[in-house]
């Protein structure tokens, strides 16, 4: 997560050097492949407004899938993390309800769900809990073989997160990124929900 305004004031000579970039994905435990979700739907799931997997909003974009009429079990981080910052930044970007009620941060007041520590804890909870959904880093999802949903981007395309999709998002954002010696300019930098057909 970028330095906050308060942290910048405490370290006025800091140089902001982003050292890594990656994707955070909605991983799920359902007996189906190829699940599709939208940002607003994810916002409603994590707000507890959509509670069943066969909710009409989910089923309407997954016409070829037989989704269960079971309760959705939300899994989130119990510890503060950059992964949570990225996920809640995304939800704030795509869901006005989430932005107004919860917002973004390394740690937030989750309205629903069960907490687990670290990517490993969240992954273990998802893998051992049928009908669950949570968020983990893409690299972790790939190495552990977790299913993760394709998410609709700004262009209306459903994108399965990948290294190439991450590169596409970064390529769009790169020309407008501030210099490293301007840490205050990085406070609101984000590449979540990036424009572009493949982001």
Q: Which functions belong to the PLM regions below?
A:
Residues 1-7, 17-19, 100-199:
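Flexible, solvent-exposed loop/hinge segments that line or gate ligand/substrate-binding clefts
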Residues 1-61, 66-67, 123-127, 133-144, ...:
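N-terminal segment of the mature folded domain
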Residues 12-14, 28-33, 71-77, 109-113:
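Second-shell loop/turn segments in exported
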Residues 37-41, 83, 178, 199:
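Short amphipathic alpha-helical coupling segments at ligand-binding clamshell hinges
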Residues 49, 90-94, 129:
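Alpha-helix boundary/capping residues
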Residues 49-75, 181-199:
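Ligand-binding clefts/hinges and TM-proximal coupling segments of bilobed small-molecule sensing domains
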Residues 58-111:
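Ligand-binding cleft/hinge of the Venus flytrap
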């Amino acid at each position: 997560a970028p330095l906050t305004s308060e942290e910048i004031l405490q370290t006025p000579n800091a140089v902001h050097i982003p050292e890594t970039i990656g994707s955070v994905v909605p991983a799920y435990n359902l007996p189906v492949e190829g699940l599709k979700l939208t940002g607003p739907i994810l916002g409603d799931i994590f707000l507890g407004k959509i509670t069943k997997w066969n909710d009409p909003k989910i089923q309407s974009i997954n016409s070829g899938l037989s989704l269960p009429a079971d309760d959705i079990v939300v899994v989130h981080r119990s510890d503060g993390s950059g992964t949570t910052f990225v996920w809640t930044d995304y939800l704030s970007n795509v869901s006005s309800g989430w932005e107004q009620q919860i917002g973004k941060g390394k740690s937030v007041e989750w309205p629903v769900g069960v907490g687990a520590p670290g990517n490993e804890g969240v992954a273990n909870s998802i893998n051992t809990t049928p009908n669950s959904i949570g968020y983990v880093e893409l690299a972790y999802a790939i190495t552990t073989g977790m299913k993760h949903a394709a998410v609709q981007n700004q262009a209306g395309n459903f994108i399965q997160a990948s290294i190439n999709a991450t590169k596409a998002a970064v390529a769009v954002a790169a020309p407008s990124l501030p210099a490293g010696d301007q840490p205050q300019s990085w406070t609101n930098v984000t590449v979540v929900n990036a424009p572009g057909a493949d982001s």
